[in-house]
């Protein structure tokens, strides 16, 4: 059976969610308020948890990762309260410290991915998640498909630098580009 998850969280007004990573900005974030917030939390990778498995500062409602399951603590996979989204090729991955495979875990969905340009990032004609080799981009695509339209990011520290060709194109179109 296929689950009907498209726009599951959509509302009349733009629906918000927290997108929680484990980058340095989480250290200065009001994690207690975020954790207590009724807004859905989408966890990415360690989602506020250290690689040593220390307790998460924010327990996600939804979780995803591009990386192998062996990198993450078993409590994420075995918790039925956390809805997990994993690439289809991870179904048979072993869960650390157990004899379970990812396909044995509760509340776990597997998806197929595809490579497509960022111009087609939100292509509703595609039934696959964008394969950008990046968990954050994957989480954005999953969140958008679930119906979220406003993302509050914490611990999501990354910088995307445009290529020289992209900067040249922007400048030729009259766009003032500032690298700071």
Which functions belong to the PLM regions below?
Residues 1-180:
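Metal-ion/cofactor- or nucleotide/acyl-coenzyme-handling active-site neighborhoods
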């Amino acid at each position: 059976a296929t689950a009907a998850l498209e726009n599951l969280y959509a509302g009349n007004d733009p629906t918000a969610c927290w997108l929680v990573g484990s980058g340095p900005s989480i250290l200065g974030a009001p994690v207690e308020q975020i954790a207590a917030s009724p807004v859905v939390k989408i966890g990415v990778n360690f989602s506020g948890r250290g690689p040593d498995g220390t307790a998460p500062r924010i327990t996600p409602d939804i979780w995803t990762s591009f990386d192998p399951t062996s990198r993450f603590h078993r409590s994420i996979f075995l918790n039925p309260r956390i809805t997990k989204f994993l690439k289809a090729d991870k179904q048979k991955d072993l869960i650390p410290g157990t004899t379970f495979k990812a396909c044995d875990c509760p509340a776990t969905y597997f998806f197929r991915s595809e490579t497509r340009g960022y111009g087609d990032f939100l292509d509703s004609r595609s039934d696959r998640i964008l394969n950008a080799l990046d968990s954050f981009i994957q989480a954005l695509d999953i969140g958008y498909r679930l119906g979220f339209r406003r993302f509050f990011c914490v611990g999501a520290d990354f910088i995307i630098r445009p290529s020289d060709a992209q900067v040249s194109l922007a400048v030729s179109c009259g766009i003032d580009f500032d690298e700071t």
